């Protein structure tokens, strides 16, 4: 029985469709470089993020990038992986691996680093198909230092002065005060003496004193005699004397109860002489 053979053009077309750029370059038999891990020494403060960079050039579809930490027994402990390995749910979420946009660099970060995170770290690349290969990077060290509390900046206290210098300062201050007091007394004495001299000079010369706001006012008392001239009174013209009119009444008291005698009247208009009265008639006369 003869096996049918595919025509050559069909085989050529299948080969063209199945080929992609770099397929031969990514051959598993071709040697590839191990990843790089930097920086070699990373020092951070407690509570800050610590970030390493792992660079891997052979990023084919079938690879895994792991992040390791060396244990005290010199064994590798897997912290995180890219792509993320969901088969190990107990991993610490503080350790993260993130691919950068260029596709070859990966950030491996410790979020909020602790003091016990200090140690040795490295990254490892695993190629799965068609043959598994594992290559590790060089090791790097992480140091997490203690965070110190920020002490508020205090103003430097002045250095203590010696006792002799303090006594000198006190003596200087007291001397300055005494000197100021003496100067003030001298100024007041000069002002008062000048004011007194000006007062005496003004009294001697008879000139009025000029007002001095700084001088003490001095009061003087002068005694004199006041002379009032007598002014004679102007004689007034004589006033004509008008004779006063006086009326006289005579009351005659009769001697008997049954007899009566006529009364006599006199006035100033009549004659001045009065008629004689009888002795038996009692009478009293007074001016009206």
Curated annotation (Swiss-Prot):
Residue positions where Phosphotyrosine is found in the record: 223, 248
Modification after translation (UniProt):
Ubiquitinated at Lys-233 by the SCF(FBXO38) complex, leading to its proteasomal degradation. Ubiquitinated via 'Lys-48'-linked polyubiquitin chains. Deubiquitinated and thus stabilized by USP5. Tyrosine phosphorylated at Tyr-223 (within ITIM motif) and Tyr-248 (ITSM motif) upon ligand binding. Phosphorylation at Tyr-248 promotes the recruitment of the protein tyrosine phosphatase PTPN11/SHP-2 that mediates dephosphorylation of key TCR proximal signaling molecules, such as ZAP70, PRKCQ/PKCtheta and CD247/CD3zeta. Phosphorylation at Thr-234 promotes the recruitment of the deubiquitinase USP5.
Tagged with keyword Nucleotide-binding = no
Motif segment (ITIM motif): 221-226
Organism of origin is Homo sapiens (Human)
Upper classification of the organism:
Eukaryota, Metazoa, Chordata, Craniata, Vertebrata
Disease with which this protein is associated in UniProt: Autoimmune disease with susceptibility to Mycobacterium tuberculosis: An autosomal recessive immunologic disorder characterized by lymphoproliferative autoimmunity and onset of various autoimmune diseases in early childhood. Death from autoimmune pneumonitis may occur.
Q: Which Pfam families match?
A: V-set
Q: What is this protein called?
A: Programmed cell death protein 1
One GO MF term: signaling receptor activity
Its biological purpose is as follows: Inhibitory receptor on antigen activated T-cells that plays a critical role in induction and maintenance of immune tolerance to self. Delivers inhibitory signals upon binding to ligands CD274/PDCD1L1 and CD273/PDCD1LG2. Following T-cell receptor (TCR) engagement, PDCD1 associates with CD3-TCR in the immunological synapse and directly inhibits T-cell activation.
Record CDD domains = IgV_PD1
């Amino acid at each position: 029985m003869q096996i049918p053979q595919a025509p050559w053009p069909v085989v050529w077309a299948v080969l063209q469709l199945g080929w992609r750029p770099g397929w031969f370059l990514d051959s598993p038999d071709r040697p590839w470089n191990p990843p790089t891990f930097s920086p070699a020494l990373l020092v951070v403060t407690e509570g800050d993020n610590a970030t390493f960079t792992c660079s891997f050039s052979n990023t084919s579809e079938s690879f895994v990038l792991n992040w390791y930490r060396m244990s005290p027994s010199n064994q590798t402990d897997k912290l995180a992986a890219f792509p993320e390995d969901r088969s190990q749910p107990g991993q610490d979420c503080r350790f993260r691996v993130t691919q950068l946009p260029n596709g070859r660099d990966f950030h491996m970060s410790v979020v909020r680093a602790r003091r016990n995170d200090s140690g040795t770290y490295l990254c490892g690349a695993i190629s799965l198909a068609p043959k598994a290969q594992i290559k590790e990077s060089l090791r790097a060290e992480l140091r997490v230092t203690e965070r110190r509390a920020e002490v508020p900046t205090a103003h430097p206290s002045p250095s203590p002065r010696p006792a002799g210098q303090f006594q000198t300062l006190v003596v200087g201050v007291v001397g300055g005060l005494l000197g100021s007091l003496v100067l003030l007394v001298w100024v007041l004495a000069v002002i008062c003496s000048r004011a007194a001299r000006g007062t005496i000079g003004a009294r001697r010369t008879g000139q009025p004193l000029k007002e001095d706001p700084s001088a003490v006012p001095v009061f003087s008392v002068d005694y004199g005699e006041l002379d009032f001239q007598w002014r004679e009174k102007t004689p007034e013209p004589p006033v004509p004397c008008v004779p006063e009119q006086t009326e006289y009444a005579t009351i005659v008291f009769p001697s008997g109860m049954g007899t009566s005698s006529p009364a006599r009247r006199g006035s100033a208009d009549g004659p001045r002489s009065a008629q004689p009265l009888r002795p038996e008639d009692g009478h009293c006369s007074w001016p009206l």
